[in-house]
A protein has these predicted regions:
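Core segments of cupin and vicinal oxygen chelate
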Residues: 7, 14-56
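Short, charged/polar surface micro-motifs in flexible loops or helix N-caps
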Residues: 52-57, 65-67, 83-85
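Helix N-cap motif at beta-to-alpha junctions
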Residues: 19-20, 80-83
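Vicinal oxygen chelate
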Residues: 1-6, 12-15, 36-37, 45, ...
Length: 125
């Protein structure tokens, strides 16, 4: 009997934000993501962003009661072809890096901050 995967992909990953407008500006203008959904949701908005080459969406939304997550470390990694080139490009746009590119046995990584103080790994290899 053939079995199928019950879970087929990661639909979205949430990034907690305090100021949704400021976060949208950061992720679209500096990171190059595109807004695909922006609709009211309670006292906030449900904002989904797409990355050009990925089916997984990024959601800029903080569930009530989880504001303590804003400004924390995102346990995941954004993949790029060349960390050093991307680091130079994003640094020129004003993106703050807390760790410059570093080569490891498994590849290269750097850590940057978004407009809300959240930290993210960017990696290749």
């Amino acid at each position: 009997m053939e079995t199928r995967d019950v879970i087929t992909q990661l639909k979205f990953a949430g990034i907690p934000v305090r100021d949704q407008d400021r976060a949208v500006q950061f992720w679209t203008e500096k990171m190059g993501f595109k807004v695909v959904t922006d609709q009211p949701m309670g006292e906030q908005r449900w904002i989904e962003l797409s990355i050009r080459t990925s089916t997984t969406r990024i959601v800029l939304f903080t569930p009530p009661g989880h504001e303590d997550r804003i400004g924390s470390f995102f346990n995941g990694s954004f993949e790029c072809d060349d960390v050093e080139a991307t680091w130079r490009q994003l640094s020129a746009k004003g993106v703050e890096f807390v760790k410059p590119p570093k080569r490891e046995d498994w590849g290269t990584s750097a850590i940057f901050k978004d407009s809300e103080g959240n930290q993210f790994v960017m990696s290749s290899g």
